[in-house]
A protein has these predicted regions:
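Catalytic-site microenvironment of enzymes
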Residues: 2-4, 8, 12-15, 19-272
Length: 272
């Protein structure tokens, strides 16, 4: 798993350095550069689908999405390994959807567990989801508010060259702030598509996500494999280009945000 993740982060580092370097004067006025600048100025969207690995037939619909969707796979799901292998072969981003309290199960991080036990559970979860280049929390409202375990997690992810996405299941989360503190490549979720999985509510959330992307320049969306969510995404994702939205992968979104908090999550780029 480390061998898979390391080239990804190395490429991201090169991307950040390249983006920071000034273009030669002769290139600044060239049509390709003008096109690149226009593309960079377009709003960007990153999409993660959580809770995968439980129903392979259903989850394969996510693999058919026409773009860089990230698949967040539960380590204790019966099809976790098979789906991770298929997603990696399809060129999609594989993520570990790491259970955290109040979630239960053999991999869950829970308050009161010693550091060695937390480390062991992370090791086993990553073995269950091969090719993971990052992780986000599954549930976790009881864990992501605890600074010491979150700092320990982010330090370990930094050592493994993995990124972190804070699902923000608790408004008091310190997970993203801990990632920022140790300099870990990380993001924070902006929109849950389907807290209410009714078709009308999912459609409303998707419109809100596009509006937020246009307002702040980027949006990170998390959805789940509900019928209503999959149906909406199958219909709407092919329309993003026409809508002026660039659908980007997690690495591009991390580079876009450069570990800075959005206004809803912090101040002057620093997480609250």
């Amino acid at each position: 798993m480390r061998r898979v993740a390391l080239p990804w982060l190395a490429a991201l580092t090169l991307f950040l350095h390249a983006a920071a370097a000034p273009a030669p004067a002769a290139d600044r006025a060239s049509p390709p550069e003008a096109q690149r600048q226009a593309s960079v100025s377009r709003p960007r969207l990153a999409l993660v689908i959580d809770d995968l690995g439980q129903n392979l037939h259903r989850d394969l619909r996510v693999l058919q999405f026409p773009g860089p969707v990230a698949l967040a796979i539960l380590p204790d799901a019966p099809h976790a390994r098979a789906l991770a292998e298929k997603a990696n072969s399809a060129g999609k981003t594989v993520m570990l959807h790491m259970p955290m309290a109040p979630a239960g199960g053999p991999y869950a991080w829970r308050p009161g567990l010693p550091h060695d036990a937390l480390q062991h559970r992370l090791d086993e979860a990553l073995r269950a989801v091969p090719h993971a280049s990052g992780l986000n929390n599954h549930m976790g409202s009881e864990m992501t508010v605890r600074q010491l375990p979150m700092l320990a997690l982010m330090t370990e992810l930094q050592r493994r060259h993995l990124f972190f996405l804070d699902s923000r299941t608790n408004r008091g989360t310190v997970a993203a702030a801990s990632a920022q503190q140790v300099g870990l490549a990380s993001l924070s979720r902006d929109i849950f598509l389907d807290d209410d999985p009714s078709p009308a509510a999912v459609a409303t959330q998707f419109r809100e996500a596009l509006a937020l992307a246009r307002k702040q320049g980027s949006v990170v969306i998390i959805g789940h494999p509900h019928r209503s969510t999959l149906a909406l995404l199958e219909r709407e994702l092919p329309r993003l280009e026409e809508a002026g939205i660039d659908w980007v992968d997690m690495g591009q979104m991390i580079a876009t945000r450069a570990n800075r908090a959005m206004a809803a999550h912090g101040r002057d780029g620093v997480y609250r």
